[in-house]
């Protein structure tokens, strides 16, 4: 049975690819947690926590597209399952990576993820990181290689140009392998930006 969002009456089914619905429904029923869809957060796409009541809650940002939302949801379910099976272990350690790979297997299908994302996703899952944003190619593919309205990816900004990020001005500098050196105009320190950061 599909679980509506608490107090909102909306269903999560509109947030994921249609062919993924039965698999997600099974995971929600099997692992007994509340799924809460929340407003965009700057620092994370989702999280898993045990509430003071002892119940488990997973939150996922409402601004993600269906493919990002599904991946984030399964990422957080993997934290929950890892907690159930192994107790307190490293948040993105080997136990979590193994559980995450296992939970993602049913979703690695061309009727759920487009082919251009599937190969990148399979590669990412071989050694998943805390955030899909750390894998630049996967992150860009999940976003459809399109930045949010009114923003640009840092790699699209011209060398030497000044841009704003979190209300601070930076000047784009040289590229180091996968990241760009950017000078904070206020404190004159150099920071490294992943090339998929939106500014």
Predicted region positions:
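Metalloprotease/metallohydrolase-associated module, dominated by Zn2+-dependent proteases
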Residues: 3-51, 57-58, 63, 87-199
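Conserved strand-to-helix beginnings and helix N-cap segments that scaffold or border functional pockets
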Residues: 70-71, 93
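Conserved short loop/helix modules at catalytic or binding sites
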Residues: 65-69
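Active-site recognition of the HExxH zinc-binding catalytic motif
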Residues: 71-84
């Amino acid at each position: 049975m599909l679980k509506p969002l608490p107090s909102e009456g909306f269903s999560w089914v509109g947030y994921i690819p249609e062919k993924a619905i039965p698999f997600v429904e099974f995971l929600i029923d099997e692992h007994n947690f509340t799924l809460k869809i929340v407003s965009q957060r700057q620092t994370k796409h989702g999280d898993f926590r045990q509430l003071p009541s002892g119940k488990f809650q997973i939150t996922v940002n409402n601004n993600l597209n269906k493919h990002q939302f599904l991946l984030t949801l399964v990422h957080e379910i993997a934290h929950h399952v890892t907690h159930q099976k192994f107790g307190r272990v490293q948040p993105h350690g080997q136990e979590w990576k193994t559980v995450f790979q296992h939970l993602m297997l049913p979703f690695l299908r061309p009727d759920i993820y487009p082919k251009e994302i599937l190969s990148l996703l399979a590669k990412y899952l071989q050694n998943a990181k805390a955030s899909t944003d750390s894998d630049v190619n996967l992150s860009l593919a999940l976003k459809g290689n399109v930045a949010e309205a009114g923003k640009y990816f840092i790699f699209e900004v011209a060398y030497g140009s000044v841009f704003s990020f979190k209300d601070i001005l930076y000047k784009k500098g040289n590229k180091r392998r996968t990241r760009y050196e950017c000078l904070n105009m206020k404190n004159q320190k150099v920071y490294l930006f992943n090339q998929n950061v939106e500014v």
